[in-house]
């Protein structure tokens, strides 16, 4: 069974979806689901993008099954590496997804990041930050949305072009391949042909460097977007000779 390995319910600050809606949507679309609530301990607004993990397991364990798994999306940061590692070690998540949501302490959603510096400088810093964070979060199962910055980059063209940032992207890809960390195909933006075309060289390069597996995640915060653009993601994986997988009890399984 194919899994949507990245979605958020009410334990995430920015989600309005309850777990029953997520389960129902997964069943209707014949998808397994992994809940990955946000933990961003360095988020600049205190109290946001954190949740009560004990309560999460207490409330959601009854839903756990071979089609409904419980994970977490950890916002990586060098300054919170010890706290994040403690969370990883303490709790029995099925799946730990590692993300970059901040740059120099600012949410990548914030337009001020892009107004103050040229695209090349910001994008290079983004990949440098990603690599630095991966080096102190080697335990994650998958690297989320490598193209996250392109959602919000307030430039005339906010896309990532592999040939422009290949040195930085290759360092990230080599690291995760060496550490056997999987990469996610995030489907949020895959409704656009040009996005698929721009991302394809990154995933092909991952494959060339020895990467074999991908997780596929919608990053859904609403029931209607669970499984969004999965057809395009599965085609991308096939074209790059990558096998879709999911994680249960931190063990990789074939989708």
Curated annotation (Swiss-Prot):
Domain of life: Bacteria
A GO cellular component annotation in the UniProt record: cytoplasm
Pathway: Amino-acid biosynthesis; L-histidine biosynthesis; L-histidine from 5-phospho-alpha-D-ribose 1-diphosphate: step 8/9
EC number: 3.1.3.15
A molecular function GO annotation: histidinol-phosphatase activity
Pfam families recorded: PHP (PF02811)
The keyword Hydrolase is annotated on this UniProt entry: yes
InterPro entries referenced in this protein's UniProt entry, alphabetically: Histidinol_P_phosphatase_HisJ, PHP_dom, Pol/histidinol_Pase-like
Reactions the enzyme catalyzes: L-histidinol phosphate + H2O = L-histidinol + phosphate
PANTHER family reported for this sequence: HISTIDINOL PHOSPHATASE-RELATED, HISTIDINOL-PHOSPHATASE
NCBIfam families according to UniProt: hisJ_fam, PRK05588.1
Protein name: Probable histidinol-phosphatase
Taxonomic lineage from the root: Bacteria, Bacillati, Bacillota, Clostridia, Eubacteriales
Gene that this polypeptide is encoded by: hisK
